[in-house]
Amino acid sequence: MNDVYEMVKQFKRKYPFTIAWRLKKNSMIVQKHLNPGEKIKYAFAAQKNNGVFSLFSTCVVVLTNQRLLVGYKRVIFGYYFSSITPDMYNDLQVYHGLLWGRITIDTIDEEVYLSNIAPSALVEIETNVTRFMIREKKKFLARGKKESCDKTNADL
């Protein structure tokens, strides 16, 4: 059963103005890369690019209990997959345009551009991603502080 596809279909039904194609194929890429024990929290579709008029790079973005996954199946062969863990996450920017919106996810390595999203979906996406990343990043930082304190105490 493809849980990713079902969640993306729900998103597409809720926000039909979002431009997205080949949802089943794109969902299969992300489904393939889910780790055992990973639970899907939120999923949506967008175009993985910065341009409004580039309509043929639909990707599926999935927020799990461990990370953010971005995947899309290429038309001829191959696919693209990216994983953003909370420790790699820096910031998220939202742009609300006249017809569509855009989200930029800033990581340590790169900026991920997700465009052609229904403007009404932007707040929901931002809330889900930001809330998860902040919560998990706090856990990660607390774990790092504890480990450094333990190491300092061991050195004494």
Task: Describe every region a protein language model picked out.
Residues 46, 65, 72, 107:
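Flexible glycine-/small-residue-rich
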